[in-house]
Structures are given as structure tokens and as C-alpha cells.
């Protein structure tokens, strides 16, 4: 049996340099290779004309450049494109491309499903199968960039921002998320500014501390409730890492980070008559008073079987005005791609659930309804 080839998309620059050294080659060859892969979108070693023929033969024998394939895509009326990405064994994750006048953002998945059980999120209802590998994470960026079109003459890439806000909790897959983000930031990789790469978390505090020690990228935090009682229901990881502990981790991250410019983005999904009252707005403002932040209010995006509804524009407006009375910066997120189920909280993919989440959910639906009313 032939030896399995090394997928070079699984290696950041440090890993590639180590591989080239082990092959008896100069480490700078790794830099050349990365430029071909990430600047020009080349996956065929024989097209890399500044790499000598002997080294190309070695690479062909031992290595490969393989990104997961796009199974299908849907385009929204607003230009948003949702991609189904095949990660093997009949499973798919979803990746969303959001073009705007001054930027093009890609929302990337980190897991097949999600191990957390946020009750308003479609991904969470599908259960969890496994973590994505480095090549499956960075491969989403590479594959979509290839679909939209690398400008091979200049090395210009069609993606300016990446947000780790797709399927999964990124901080539960740090082993692979950190090297993937390293490649996004690397000058020989996708060469994105650290302020243009954002990782989102629901509050896995020990992993947040580890991330802060390893990497400096923008941070978005999923709060969604102004107190522990409600957050225990909406974001059950709160039972393990309650709000005060989470806020402490956020403040420690901000203290280490330059990418956040001294403040963090707070994500708060607006659920009709659940977390959107003016009293809850006052409570949220007081909760966040010692944490430098801007607050992103996200109108809830319904999905089939969801127990929640979207807050009305008038309730969102009142909630926003209360927060601004406290001097907080507030943004109401514009919904993108909801007509193709590509908006925040709607990603589902195709998952072989290892947690039996769907069966358990059916038993719990009525209990959740009683708890939140």
C-alpha cells in the first residue's frame, strides 16, 4: 500500500518549513510554495515555475494540495452566496460569501455540526459529528476564492475578511482553528489584516485564554442574554462558564489584543418577547459597563421548527435606544442571505449526528417553551 500523501493545506508556514527541511530543501521554498497556493490559487506543482524540477518531483511523490469540494451553491437576491462544502462520509458544512461595496466577507465553519446546544441556532439542532481539519477550514477560503476568481496576474484575492462564525464553536477546535487562522494572516498565505479575521465564541473561557496567548485576531462574543438565568436556557454552556467568568475572559483577551482596538464585538440575537424588553436592555447595559465593546443587535433568523420569533423593528429600536442612553455603540445588523437560509443562525449542512441531538430535542421542546415564558 502506498504511503498517504501529505495535504499541504494542513500545514502553516512553520509546518511547511519543517517539512522542506526534512526533505533536504531550503526553508524559503515553503514561502514560495505558499504564494503559489494562496496568492495565485495554484494546486498543481508542475505549474510552479520558480520551483526546480527535482523538487517538484519530490512534492508530487509525497504531497498533495486538496481542498474540500463545493457540492452546491445558492445565490441570494442580495448577492450573498451559500456554499455546501463536501467534507467526506456524506457530510457537508456550509460557508457563506457576503459581498459588499468595500469588502467581501467569508463566513467559515469550524466543526461538522456543533457540540453546544444554543436553542435559537439551526446548526445546534443538527447535533455534532467532528472537528474540521486545518485543510477543511482553510480549504473553505481557498475553494471559495477559486470559485469567485483569483487574479493570477497580480495575486489579488477576492476575499478581504474572514469571520469564524459558521457551523461549530471555533474555540472547541483550537488545535486546527489556530493554524488555519495563521495561514489567513500570513503574508505568504491569504495575507489578511488581523483586524479582518474575526473569531466568535459562545463562551468557552479556558480556550479563550489559550487563543489570546497564541494569536491576535478580532473577537466577537455571543452574549444573547443579560443574566445567567436566561442565558442558561439560550446558551447552555453558560451553566459551565457563567457571564461574570465569560466577561473576565473577554477583558483578559482585550488587554492582550491589538486587533480589537481596545474593545470587543458583542453579539445579541433579538428574540421576540424573550430577551428584547427595555428592562433587559437596561440590564444588558449595566452588565457590559466595565467591558469596552460595541453591541451588534442581530434580528433573529427563523428556521424550520424554531421555537422563537424575530423581534419587531419597534422592539429592536427601543432596545437599541436604551443601550445608547448608556453611551454604548450599537449596530443593528443588516440581515443578509435569509432567503437562502444563509443568515446568522440558519446554517445547517448535512451532519451525521453523534450526539443524538435531534431525538433529545424533540423530548425537550415543550420543557424549553415552559422555561422561557
Swiss-Prot record:
It is an enzyme of class 2 (transferase). Its EC number is 2.1.1.192. The keyword 4Fe-4S applies. It catalyses: adenosine(2503) in 23S rRNA + 2 reduced [2Fe-2S]-[ferredoxin] + 2 S-adenosyl-L-methionine = 2-methyladenosine(2503) in 23S rRNA + 5'-deoxyadenosine + L-methionine + 2 oxidized [2Fe-2S]-[ferredoxin] + S-adenosyl-L-homocysteine; adenosine(37) in tRNA + 2 reduced [2Fe-2S]-[ferredoxin] + 2 S-adenosyl-L-methionine = 2-methyladenosine(37) in tRNA + 5'-deoxyadenosine + L-methionine + 2 oxidized [2Fe-2S]-[ferredoxin] + S-adenosyl-L-homocysteine. One of its GO terms (biological process) is tRNA methylation. Pfam families: Radical_SAM (PF04055), RlmN_N (PF21016). Residues 100-339 form the Radical SAM core domain. Its cofactor is [4Fe-4S] cluster. Specifically methylates position 2 of adenine 2503 in 23S rRNA and position 2 of adenine 37 in tRNAs. m2A2503 modification seems to play a crucial role in the proofreading step occurring at the peptidyl transferase center and thus would serve to optimize ribosomal fidelity. Reaction proceeds by a ping-pong mechanism involving intermediate methylation of a conserved cysteine residue. This is Dual-specificity RNA methyltransferase RlmN. It comes from Shewanella woodyi (strain ATCC 51908 / MS32). The gene is rlmN.
Amino acid at each position: 500500500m502506498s504511503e498517504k500523501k501529505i495535504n499541504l493545506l494542513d500545514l502553516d508556514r512553520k509546518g511547511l518549513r519543517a517539512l522542506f527541511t526534512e526533505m533536504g530543501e531550503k526553508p524559503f521554498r515553503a514561502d514560495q510554495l505558499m504564494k503559489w497556493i494562496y496568492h495565485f490559487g495554484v494546486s498543481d506543482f508542475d505549474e510552479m515555475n520558480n520551483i526546480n524540477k527535482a523538487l517538484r518531483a519530490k512534492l508530487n511523490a509525497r504531497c498533495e494540495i486538496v481542498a474540500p469540494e463545493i457540492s452546491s451553491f445558492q445565490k441570494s437576491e442580495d448577492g450573498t452566496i451559500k456554499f455546501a462544502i463536501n467534507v467526506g462520509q456524506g457530510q457537508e458544512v456550509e460557508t457563506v460569501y457576503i459581498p459588499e461595496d468595500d469588502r467581501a466577507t467569508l463566513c467559515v465553519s469550524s466543526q461538522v455540526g456543533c457540540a453546544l446546544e444554543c436553542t435559537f441556532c439551526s446548526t445546534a439542532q443538527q447535533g455534532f459529528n467532528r472537528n474540521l481539519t486545518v485543510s477543511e477550514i482553510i480549504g473553505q477560503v481557498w475553494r471559495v476564492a477559486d470559485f469567485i476568481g483569483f487574479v493570477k496576474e497580480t495575486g489579488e484575492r477576492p476575499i478581504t475578511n474572514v469571520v469564524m462564525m459558521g457551523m461549530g464553536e471555533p474555540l472547541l477546535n483550537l488545535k486546527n482553528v489556530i493554524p488555519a487562522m495563521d495561514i489567513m494572516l500570513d503574508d505568504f498565505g491569504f495575507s489578511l489584516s488581523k483586524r479582518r479575521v474575526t473569531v466568535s465564541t459562545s463562551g468557552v473561557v479556558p480556550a479563550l485564554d489559550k487563543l489570546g496567548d497564541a494569536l491576535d485576531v478580532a473577537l466577537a462574543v455571543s452574549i444573547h442574554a443579560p443574566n445567567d438565568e436566561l442565558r442558561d436556557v439560550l446558551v447552555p454552556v453558560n451553566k459551565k462558564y457563567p457571564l461574570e467568568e465569560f466577561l473576565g475572559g473577554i477583558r483578559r483577551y482585550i488587554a492582550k489584543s491589538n486587533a480589537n482596538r481596545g474593545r470587543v464585538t458583542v453579539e445579541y440575537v433579538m428574540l421576540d418577547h424573550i430577551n428584547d424588553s427595555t428592562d433587559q436592555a437596561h440590564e444588558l447595559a449595566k452588565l457590559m459597563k466595565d467591558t469596552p465593546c460595541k453591541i451588534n443587535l442581530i434580528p433573529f433568523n427563523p428556521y424550520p421548527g424554531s421555537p422563537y420569533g424575530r423581534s419587531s423593528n419597534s422592539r429592536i429600536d427601543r432596545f437599541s435606544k436604551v443601550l445608547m442612553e448608556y453611551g454604548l455603540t450599537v449596530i443593528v445588523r443588516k440581515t443578509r442571505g435569509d432567503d437562502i437560509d444563509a443568515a446568522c443562525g440558519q446554517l445547517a449542512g448535512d451532519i451525521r449526528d453523534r450526539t443524538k441531538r435531534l431525538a433529545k430535542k424533540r423530548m425537550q421542546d415543550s420543557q424549553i417553551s415552559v422555561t422561557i415564558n
